């Protein structure tokens, strides 16, 4: 098992959890782009940033206790990381390999499916669940209403898991 995370705290946490569980894994600090250099993999599980982000100056100040901004901020449509990840996913996988990708319904699920399929991957939504807005989306709810991503008063989002298989 090889794990990549851009956040140093997450890397330390993963190493600690592996030690407690008595398993040996290779944990590296880096983005999915760094993972391309170690590819191909049989299974890739990805939870990239996917939260739509207001333009500079329109974003309310979020508590530092929520974690680093890069853990969720993903550009105005939520696809800043999703789009290049989906376009490169086939390069992360060996033949017969699978990608499991989690994202918000606010960040263009069909776009992800189309992008994955355009690289000859077989892609489908395999799980979805509606959940209440967490603190980040709650802070951005007014902006999300203004740009039409959520209807007025809506305070829940759909999270989906996409599976993409490489033949």
Summary of predicted features, one role per range:
Residues 1-5:
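Conserved SAM-binding motif I beta-strand of class I
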Residues 7-9:
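Conserved SAM/SAH-binding beta-strand->alpha-helix loop
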Residues 14-15:
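Conserved SAM-binding loop
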Residues 22-32:
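Conserved SAM-binding strand-loop segment of SAM-dependent methyltransferases
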Residues 33-44:
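A short acidic, Gly/Pro-enriched loop at the edge of an enzyme's catalytic core
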Residues 39, 48-81:
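Mobile active-site "lid"/loop adjacent to the S-adenosyl-L-methionine
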Residues 78-137:
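Conserved Class I SAM-dependent methyltransferase catalytic core
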Residues 119-122, 138-167:
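Core SAM-dependent methyltransferase catalytic element
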